[in-house]
Amino acid sequence: MSRMLPSMVPGVVRDAEGKARSDDVAYEFLAFKLGSETYALPLAGVQEILKPPRITRVPRASHEILGIVSVRGRVTTVIDLRRRLRVPEGPIDKNTRVLLVEAGNEVLGMLVDAVLQVYRLYEDEVELASAVGGDMNEYVMGIGRPRAVRTLGRSTSQDRSDPNDILILLHAEPLLRR
């Protein structure tokens, strides 16, 4: 399966006693909210998380493009991830963030409702998109079902995640295509 998750960065995995395990590979994802769903992108592609800066609208841009922003002198396009993924519109509030994401040679901003946390997932915690189905397969890598929240590389009984936690794992490159 690791060949099917090429954009992830393997990390050191530790067992319940904190000892490093080399037989498993963990992949890191940044989780965020869009509406009532939790989505995640490979952490390796996320360059920065920003409070929403002033966005300049671009005439005749596609509906999904909110506009452009200047980040340290670099002009960056910002897309509304809700529109791209056909999630109902929502307000921009104090939790809203812009993720600066690199895909290929381009960096684009993605507007999300809130950033949650970084998850480390084992290969057996990921169901590939072919098992998911639907019309969003181009964007969806798969589904993540974390067994436990891993804090500082360790998993403890107090860190158990909700068994109903489901992360919709996204491919960055198709999301950023214009």
Kindly label every feature range from the protein language model:
Residues 1-178:
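An acidic, low-aromatic, low-complexity terminal/linker signal
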